[in-house]
Design a protein with these regions (language model features):
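Short juxtamembrane and helix-loop transition motifs at transmembrane-helix boundaries
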Residues: 15-20, 82-91, 108-120, 135-138
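Hydrophobic alpha-helical transmembrane segments of multi-pass membrane proteins
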Residues: 1-40, 57-75, 126-141
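Interfacial "cap-and-anchor" motif at the non-cytosolic start of specific transmembrane alpha-helices
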Residues: 109-168
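Membrane-interface helix-boundary motifs at transmembrane edges
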Residues: 11, 40-54, 111-122
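Extracellular-loop-to-transmembrane junctions of the mid-late helices
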Residues: 64-106, 140, 146
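Alpha-helical transmembrane segments in multipass membrane proteins, preferentially the mid-helix core
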Residues: 34-38, 74, 97-118
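Alpha-helical transmembrane segments of polytopic membrane proteins
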Residues: 18-29, 88-101, 151-154
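Conserved nucleotide-binding and Mg2+-coordinating catalytic segments in signaling enzymes
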Residues: 165-179
C-alpha cells in the first residue's frame, strides 16, 4: 500500500502513507525477532526456554516499535512524509538495519553455540534464511527505493521449508533416529 500512495494526493493519503510505512518497519524487525524465536525453539524444542529468552530477544524490536510510534507524531525519526506525500527515510532507519543484523547474527550464534554444547543438530538451515535475508537488507539499504528484503524473505522461507521437509522425510520426529 505504501508504494501505491507514495506521491499521490487524495483525502487521507498522507495518513495511509504514514501508517503503511510504519507497519512495514515494524513487520521487518518482527521477522528478525520471530526468526530468532523459531531458531531457539527448533534447537532446544522447549517453549519455556524460548519464552524466557524472548525477554532479551524482544529488546531491539521494542526499540524499533517505540521509534516508529514516535515517528507517527511527525518527529521524522525513522522517515518523513513531505507535503507532497513523498516518503523519505531518515537517519533513524539505521536502527532497523542494525536490529536485523543483530537478529541474524544472534540466530547464527544460537546454532553454533548449541552445537558446542552438544545439542544434536544434524543440519539446521540457518544460513539458508539469513543469507538471502541479509542480501535483501543490504540491497535495500544501498539502493533507496527498492524493496528486495521481503522478496528474499519469501525465498528464504521456501528454502527453510524445503530443508525441514527433506529432513522430516528421513528422520523420525519423536526419536530423532534415521528411517
Amino acid at each position: 500500500i505504501a508504494f501505491l500512495v507514495d506521491g499521490k494526493q487524495f483525502t487521507g493519503s498522507r495518513q495511509i502513507n504514514y501508517i503503511s510505512n510504519s507497519i512495514c518497519f515494524i513487520g521487518t524487525v518482527s521477522m528478525g525477532m520471530l526468526w530468532c524465536m523459531y531458531v531457539e525453539l527448533r534447537i532446544y524444542r522447549n517453549y519455556k526456554r524460548m519464552v524466557q529468552k524472548a525477554g532479551v530477544e524482544i529488546f531491539p524490536w521494542l526499540v524499533e516499535v517505540i521509534m516508529v510510534l514516535c515517528n507517527l507524531f511527525g518527529t521524522g525519526i525513522m522517515f518523513k512524509i513531505s507535503g507532497e506525500n513523498v516518503y523519505q527515510r531518515t537517519a533513524g532507519v539505521l536502527v532497523g538495519y542494525i536490529s536485523l543484523v543483530i537478529y541474524f547474527a544472534y540466530s547464527i550464534y544460537l546454532v553454533y553455540h548449541s552445537k558446542k554444547q552438544g545439542v544434536n543438530l544434524n543440519f539446521f538451515p540457518v544460513i539458508y534464511f539469513v543469507g538471502p535475508c541479509f542480501a535483501g537488507v543490504v540491497l535495500q539499504f544501498l539502493f533507496y527505493g527498492i524493496t528486495s528484503s521481503w522478496v528474499l524473505v519469501a525465498v528464504a522461507l521456501i528454502f527453510v521449508q524445503m530443508q525441514s521437509y527433506a529432513e522430516s522425510l528421513y528422520m523420525d520426529e519423536l526419536s530423532g533416529l534415521y528411517n
